[in-house]
């Protein structure tokens, strides 16, 4: 089911000069989206939202394209998962316009709702296909774990090794669903990721070492932001380098143990040990 709230944002945008009060009216009419969004994915401050209002005009044409194309892309990618993996699960997608925080995310549930923030997305159809395939990849992965007897009571969702592994699997599977694009698109969801990818390739050893150091010293929300959020990038000048590490780890598992082990590694092996051993190589 697709809950597309972008048209109600556009209606407000076109009918009035959007001020904070008007924007907040949109946010409060969709608590199913914005409670989660402002809790974990975007600061809910007047300054942040006033800046967003200034940034919307440059993005409004893209948002108009995305409100029409994204629901079609979601259906198309859902069908691709069905055709490739015989994957049929009822999923819920929320499309919205936010405050320039996260671009897309999934609730931390086995079959969590998926959220897509139009102002942070590229309107290019292939870019949309990849980010949708990535988010559905998280759900597919969870269902595979569930089918293999995963004990969710023991799942440490916020652990660094878990984050690294889960983002790696979602990226890995998105490459199988949307084939033939430039490698960097699977990480950046736009055409601007080439230098970012090259930086990772040239500095992988150093990046692995730094992640391992952060992990050993104790994981914090600041470190999660540094490695896995758009707001990171203090260490090396590039954010979300954890996605590259995760995909490299998953490709290593696929090579060493076979592809079927990729999706169930978390409940069959000691994930922390596996990740730490790989980071130390």
Please name every model-derived segment.
Residues 70, 129, 162, 166, ...:
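Hydrophobic (often cysteine-bearing) scaffold residues that line and stabilize catalytic clefts
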Residues 89, 95-115, 136-152:
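A short mid-domain helix/strand-loop element embedded in enzyme catalytic domains
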Residues 130-143, 167-171:
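Active-site recognition of the HExxH zinc-binding catalytic motif
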Residues 118-131:
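Short pre-active-site segment immediately N-terminal to the catalytic Zn-binding motif
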Residues 2-16, 152-206, 210, 279-281:
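Post-HExxH zinc-binding segment in Zn-dependent metallohydrolases
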Residues 1-67:
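Non-catalytic architectural context of zinc metalloproteases
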Residues 202-281:
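Pan-zinc metallopeptidase signature
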Residues 53-110, 125-126:
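Auxiliary, metal-adjacent structural segments of Zn-dependent hydrolase domains
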